[in-house]
Amino acid sequence: MADFGTNVGEKFARNVLQVFFENSIADSITNNDYEGEIKGGGADRVNVLTFGSLSLKDYTGAAMTADTPSENEGQLIVNQKKAYYFKIESFAKFASYVDNPESSLIQNAGKVLAETVDKYVLGLYGDVAAGNRIGTDYVTGTVAVATTTGVVTGTGTTFTSAMVGRGFKATGHTKWYRIKTYTSATSITIEDDLDDVASAYTGGDIAGGASYTIEAATKLQVANTTIYGYLLDLKTKLDQAKVPMTDRWLVVPSKIGNLMLKATELIPAVSTAYENVVTKGILGYVSGFKVYQNEQVTGDNSAGYRVLAGHKSWCTLAVAFTESGVEDLIGAFGKAYKGLTVYGAKVIDERRKAGAELFCYV
């Protein structure tokens, strides 16, 4: 019976994962390009590898010197753990439920897991590259930036703690940086937009009186007459970052999704793809994005929605059942099922540019 219980537990895990993959949009918008084994004993670490850009050489027939491509490695920490633990009144009935992937038990377990992982992945809006956000920018006053420390001293500014994590760029900067800490209404600290190396600021000195931009500091309002323009802005962010045109996605809550369906410009694109909208909440295809509707998008209409767009290369996701079995209840008659699911996600620095965010409300 012990072996049978183990086999039933393994089948439960396999079928729940099948339902998870059928329903989770997280699986559709991420990749699993990692190396290593997930064991579940602790916070497992697997490696995410990526290569830097390659270059073409002019060939003249002479001997060539081989380039050394850069290989970047990030660690994905599988530190999210969720457990199933419930009593089994009848082992025979439980085994029957487990044998049928369409049973309410398996469907409920798989869909709950999908919602949980979707919420986790859609909460990674802080891993969007600085400069890839659409919202209401903050540009009031002027600033000076100190060399090395990245301390920003504002004049006529009203910085807030909510600005931490947003992109920052002052006149004189050649790229975007990220707000690291908030000190006061006139003082913040910025850093390079990197997570896989030690925090540093390499943007140099910016003299006082410089104009600047803090991207998407507050939410902006969208309507059916303006939503298409903001989608094109997201597309432009990815285009400028040279993100591949294929496998692009956009995830919106129903409030935004229904607004999109009212937009005159979007009706032809959505109608063309309407045959497949039931699968995983696919709303349609717009401006090169496969659009998903999902209520796990971070935020609400009061605080603002963190609508994410991107390419499958943006985020690496690992999900696994590491324990699954049936055991005798201690101190009582009967049995119980106990299973452990672990997951984690990582956006490595090289791929932050493959994500974009629209911070909005209706």
Spell out what each predicted region is.
Residues 2-32, 40, 45-52, 72-79, ...:
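Sequence/fold signature of self-assembling virion shell proteins
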Residues 46-48, 57-62:
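Short N-terminal amphipathic alpha-helices
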Residues 63-64, 69-72:
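Active-site-surrounding "flap" and adjacent substrate/cofactor-binding loops of secreted or lumenal enzymes
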Residues 102, 106, 161, 224-227, ...:
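Generic alpha-helical secondary structure
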Residues 137-163, 169-226:
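Small/polar beta-strand repeat architecture
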